[in-house]
Amino acid sequence: MVEGDFVDEQSNIALLSSKSMCGDHHSVKNSIGDEIFKLLTKILNSDEKASGDVHTLVSGTPDLSNFNLDNEPLENILAVFIISFIIVVVGVLLLGLIGMIFISLRSGSSNDKKLQSNDEEKQALAEKA
């Protein structure tokens, strides 16, 4: 058995198992695991091409055709940007809320000290009078 045949068998088994898990319900968006699986099988099936691609990427040539961004559905890219934006906005809002609570606690304790000193001054003035 040639090594390529073994890789083909393994990729076919994994593909059949992923199809059986999904059933006949195929959505427009592919999961990240499916994309990683496709990339790994592509690398395993073409050893020479993969090693050449790695060599060109390491040597620093700007060959972006290896990443296949033109085949990526636009919905997936937009979904990633939208989710990232939502995470950033929620994080900033939470940090702002925590900051406001911290500032209000600090100012509240300093206001109590000011009120207490004002009361003591009033009592001292009242006792003198």
Swiss-Prot record:
Q: What are the start and end residues of every segment in region (Disordered)?
A: 109-129
What further note is attached to this protein's record? Present with 922 molecules/cell in log phase SD medium.
Q: Where is the composition biased (Basic and acidic residues)?
A: 111-129
Know the name of this protein?
Uncharacterized vacuolar protein YLR297W
Q: How does it sit in the membrane?
A: Single-pass membrane protein
Annotated Gene Ontology cellular components are: cytoplasm; fungal-type vacuole; fungal-type vacuole membrane; nucleus
Q: What induces it?
A: By the genotoxic agents methyl methanesulfonate (MMS), bleomycin and cisplatin.
Subcellular location(s) of the protein = Vacuole membrane
Annotated transmembrane regions: 77-97
User: Could you tell me which species this protein originates from?
Assistant: Saccharomyces cerevisiae (strain ATCC 204508 / S288c)
Keyword annotations from UniProtKB, A to Z: Membrane, Transmembrane, Transmembrane helix, Vacuole
Claim: Magnesium is one of the keywords in the record: no
User: Taxonomic lineage per UniProt?
Assistant: Eukaryota, Fungi, Dikarya, Ascomycota, Saccharomycotina
